[in-house]
């Protein structure tokens, strides 16, 4: 049994009491059942027009029904930005085009996202039956078409933008996404029991982020994400975010804050972010903070707690000097500036550090992007903390870090500029060498 299937079965057997749609809903008195021409056309006909019509006719106080077990071809992007109090009952299966050139032409013409959904009180509700409710994007040929030395071919679409308030996504399922999965932005959004499967049988699945989050009071729970980038990335101007009871893996880049500060004029404002009770399998990162040097802003009150890691290269990683091999930077940068970090906690970590085969398939630069500034890596590091200045990190706390390298040597640490004066409860002495937690 694969790790992905085992993880799914574990979560399926757990209680399904979370992620229930908000109870204070006005009546959804109208229904639109989306017709499909998929079966009659042997999978050739496009159902995009019918889907767009359903979203137009049932944009308010309605239920839009994709019937259970029915397949739909979505060969054109769907945009529905005037929704209000709508349930999208996704019990069918959606199929994106398999013609790479056709999709690239659509993206190059200006449509970068395949599903754009916007409005208050929007609920995406899939079925408990794992055989249905999928979006099939057929990303494997896209990944395999990526030339050597490149981090993804041009004109790849984002799968979904979901902008709402008092909203729910339950049983969202994405298989072989081309690249980015869901951009969540808004307030009071709950995601539960999602599955994202971006495991590859060939080339690396670049940029297959799970959920990119910007907003207030957003929760993601009881979900599985196997991908080739951040499982969750919390962006600027986010507050009160919870990521809990999830399993993430494959070549995941973990639970991330950022990246922040690429544009020095974009002030980062993030607070009250919690990652709790998460299992990370075979990832490049588990807990990560990433901001560019020269950035501005404040990130405050962030906690990673009760994190189990298995074969993870960088279990705890902080950098305020981030670089992206696939992105250029313009404008004037104040090299002494940094996005400030305050009140960060890493507690109750346990598991194994990937010493034998560290890294992942995303490296196309020399030195590798994730090794930049770290020339003497031993891949026994439990923690890497790179504060940009002696003032940019404040009130860092570590507690009960039980991480061990696969070679069964003592764990090590790389630490820069997390001064004792500003971080009296850091839990270890900030210097490079063997990780030796201080007694309380």
From Swiss-Prot:
Q: Which SUPFAM superfamilies match?
A: Pectin lyase-like
Gene3D superfamilies listed in its UniProt record: Single-stranded right-handed beta-helix, Pectin lyase-like
User: GO molecular function: any one?
Assistant: galacturan 1,4-alpha-galacturonidase activity
Quote the InterPro entries the UniProt record gives: Glyco_hydro_28, Pectin_lyas_fold, Pectin_lyase_fold/virulence
Residues folding into a coiled coil are none
- UniProt-annotated catalytic positions: 229 (proton donor), 253
Supply the EC number(s).
3.2.1.67
- Could you tell me what this protein does? Specific in hydrolyzing the terminal glycosidic bond of polygalacturonic acid and oligogalacturonates.
What is this protein's record name? Probable exopolygalacturonase C
